[in-house]
A protein has these predicted regions:
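Conserved AAA+/SF3 P-loop NTPase catalytic/coupling segment centered on the Walker-B
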Residues: 1-12, 33-34
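Conserved catalytic/switch belt of AAA+ P-loop NTPases
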Residues: 9-23
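Charged, glycine-rich active-site and insertion segments that engage polyanionic ligands
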Residues: 20-21, 29-136, 140-143, 147-211
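Conserved H-loop
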Residues: 26
Length: 214
């Protein structure tokens, strides 16, 4: 959120006279970054992260017939996001995206370029799957960098905590950040409607280059 006063004053005018059929949602770590005039014109709702125990309880209530082991698996994939946990249990695209991200992590841990390419090509022709899978893989890279720097397991955000720990043993925090940036670039290419097959081939090569330079 841009907190420059002039920008917030412009935002205030939009809030006071919003375009027709428009809902405005503002997010921030604290409402205090907004001008008092904005705060007085909006509904402020506090949000807190959901613990794994809370996720388990919610999912067990929603899916009483599902085995606890499967619910625990969904919680590990969703990492405190109950919506993601539900999508995982119902085998929506998120389930396949998690599989893709974890597969990339395993392929990197194994140091095999062919496995990287094979994992990525599962999403060939599936733009939204590839994009979401790469976004989840970025979360794994984030965890890998954090673990390398001594981060705590409880603060892990990815769908592959143990995989990120394994990756952190061979990937420095700087290398994880560089690879994160590479993946960001390729997500941008996907958004720009670049050819998916060519994008996958190029990305696999870039990941392999990062592996041989570890």
């Amino acid at each position: 959120m841009n907190t420059v006063i002039q920008v917030q004053n412009i935002l205030l005018k939009v809030i006071e006279e919003p375009p027709e059929h428009t809902a405005i949602i503002l997010t921030a770590r604290s409402k205090e970054i907004f001008l008092p005039t904005i705060i007085s014109r909006v509904l402020s709702l506090g949000m807190t992260s959901v613990t794994e125990a809370e996720s388990m309880a919610c999912l067990q209530e929603k899916y009483p017939a599902v085995a606890p082991a499967l619910i625990s698996e969904a919680v590990s994939a969703g990492r405190g996001n109950i919506g993601r946990c539900v999508e995982y249990l119902e085998h929506s695209q998120f389930f396949d995206s998690v599989k893709l991200a974890r597969g990339l992590c395993d392929a990197m841990c194994g140091g095999n370029e062919y496995d990287v390419l094979k994992t990525l090509f599962v999403a060939d022709g599936k733009k939204t799957l590839l994009r979401e899978g790469l976004s989840l893989f970025q979360e794994i890279l984030r965890d890998s960098a954090a673990f390398r720097l001594g981060g705590e397991s409880e603060k892990s955000v990815s769908c592959a905590k143990e995989g990120a720990k394994t990756l952190s043993r061979s990937l420095s925090s700087d290398q994880a950040v560089r690879l994160y940036d590479i993946v960001s670039d390729y997500i941008g290419r996907i958004d720009a409607n670049c050819n998916i097959s060519l994008t996958i081939n190029s990305l696999a090569g870039q990941i392999y280059l990062s592996l041989i330079h570890i």
